[in-house]
UniProtKB/Swiss-Prot annotation:
Glycosylation sites: 68, 107, 161, 230, 304, 314, 356, 374, 431, 442, 454, 488, 503, 553, 563, 647, 692
Membrane spanning residue stretches: 759-779
Protein name: Receptor-like protein 54
Extracellular compartment segments: 22-758
Species of provenance: Arabidopsis thaliana (Mouse-ear cress)
Amino acid sequence: MKSNLAVFFITCFFCCVFVTSDSVYTLPFPFPRDQVEILLELKNEFPSFNCDLTWKLDYFGRMDTRANISSWTKDSDSFSGVSFDSETGVVKELSLGRQCLTSLKANSSLFRFQHLRYLDLSENHFDSSPIPSGFGRLTYLESLDLSKNGFIGEVPSSISNLSRLTNLDLSYNKLTGGIPNLHSLTLLENIDLSYNKFSGAIPSYLFTMPFLVSLNLRQNHLSDPLENINYSATSKLLILDMAYNLMSHRILEPISKLANLIQIDLSFQKTPYTFNFDFLLFKSLVRLDLSGNSVSVVGTGSENLTHLDLSSCNITEFPMFIKDLQRLWWLDISNNRIKGKVPELLWTLPSMLHVNLSRNSFDSLEGTPKIILNSSISELDLSSNAFKGSFPIIPPYVNIMAASNNYFTGGIPLIFCKRYRLSLLDLSNNNFSGTIPRCLTNVSLGLEALKLSNNSLTGRLPDIEDRLVLLDVGHNQISGKLPRSLVNCTTLKFLNVEGNHINDTFPFWLKALTRLEIIVLRSNRFHGPISSPEVSLSFTALRIIDISRNSFNGSLPQNYFANWSAPLVNTPQGYRWPEYTGDEHSKYETPLWSYPSIHLRIKGRSIELGKIPDTYTSIDFSGNSFEGQIPESIGDLKSLIVLDLSNNSFTGRIPSSLAKLKQLESLDLSQNRISGNIPQELRELTFLGYVNMSHNRLTGQIPQSTQVGGQPKSSFEGNINLCGLPLQESCLRGNGVPSTPHTQEQELPKQEHALNWKAAAIGYGPGVLFGLAIGQAFARYKPVLFYKLFRL
């Protein structure tokens, strides 16, 4: 019994010791305590992890859950993004991409992980700061990814200490100076320095590093190597991307000796010289991009070539040498000066899938129906050429068909209804007439994007089946109502029916489409109210709505915008780098329907947006008959960039909540019946570049700021009694309007002068009375004390 009690007390003693000791962590594995402490110190270096959740979305819109540094605690299970060595327990890998980390310190705890082998800090917010030299202390590193961070300055020389490095990615930053010294990093297999501001000559050793497989120097300010290249027969370089630099035609001679190259991109070099490309010197090539240069091609091409881009090369003849390229499946000769017929040989290439012939002067397709119908082509772009007449026969397996900006006539051919799968059909900007074939919208066809704008199509819109992502039938002569079957298109993102004769009420039922981002109903015959007590209008994904130039009427409840979509309501957070989307001629595959083209009224002008940025937001209710007050809830739309409520009958005052729209760039309230003062808080809208409040009933002083007061006089003309810049009317007293600050400053001395006299009167009055009384007393009684003091 005594022994049991002894064991019990001893156990309790040790339990108390270990429980009360705050230096001991409960870990399921024997990780060194110092590693856990360093991890927690690293976490505390980044106090805020609040950022726009869209920053964590991958290319496909899925949430990136690889790591979450904000969840790190003493519990080792919480260290997502961290890998420990199974034998020693030290941290060997950190994957902290897309964590909204900021301000990487020069003495960061990060540089204490001496055994770290893999480090990913990509897509964070280290903007406008240099790369710390401390990275050079991580001598065990094998892979370092610092891409998409906004680092500036030169790469520290300490990077040359990383002798075990096999992968180095510094792309999409703002790094300057020459290419860093990587000569001693002989184990490198992949180097990506693209999308920076590196300048000077390319070091010749880069082409002959013993294990280097891929070298990406795209979009810098680099020029030809100055030194001769000492070629190695064992060079393993396979992929070379030097697009968007300052290379001359002379670069072809040295790189032609790299016998194993399979992919070369020399597109868009800023040189006046012609690239004389000899295929005989590049027998292993699989992919070649010479776009954006003046090119002369010699030889028949590599038998392994699968990808050829000669777009924007100023060529005048079809490249007939492709007839021998039996493995070629991707051809782009767009934006050249080629005329006449598309040769028959194009349809006979057995592997051909993608063909872009746009922006030339082709006028017809050569080849018999039998030959064309045997072609394997699945993506065909004939847009912006000189085709005319009826639409030609096309290969049977085409699933992406673009033929916009031509002169095609007649009805839309029914051959499209016989395609096995047609994802995209773009026949916009032609002279097609008649009705839209019902079969085009059958679910069995699988159409995802239908672009028929700027034709002469008539009749009603057919019922639309599911799967459609983009529908653009703007600027035709379509009548009737919007088909209610659109509510079944759960994938619809873009709807444009502008410039037709559609006669319908507001489509409240569209709010059921949870992915709908853009609605354009402009210039039709829509009518009636756009609010209803029975239906609360809430679009979950809407960011652009244009219902201008219709006959909508009624008033908008004060809470009208209270339940609108997250893209309009949420304030953008964090940083976005426009250059991350690639250059204008990026070759990354992107769905064609990602770039709908619409006309929007921005800053008083109609502007065509060919590629609408994902963060662009706009509301245009202009040219209707809305009345009543502008809802105060408009201030809830904190991400709004363009607001146009002009040419209506709105009354009441301008809501002060407009000052909450910190992203607003364009505001048009002209041609209404709005009264009262312009809210002075609008001075705080620092992005506001266009303001129009003309032809209302506004009074008082125009807010004096660059954004508002700096507008042209026409932006405020036609009001009752506005004053202040940019108008000539000054805000003097007596005009029934408040004083301007300048006038107030002039009047201030007068007011102070009057106040000073009043104060003097108040002070002098009692003093004078008191003096008279004392004087009388002196005169009558002559007190002895006063005589003694003043010797009177």
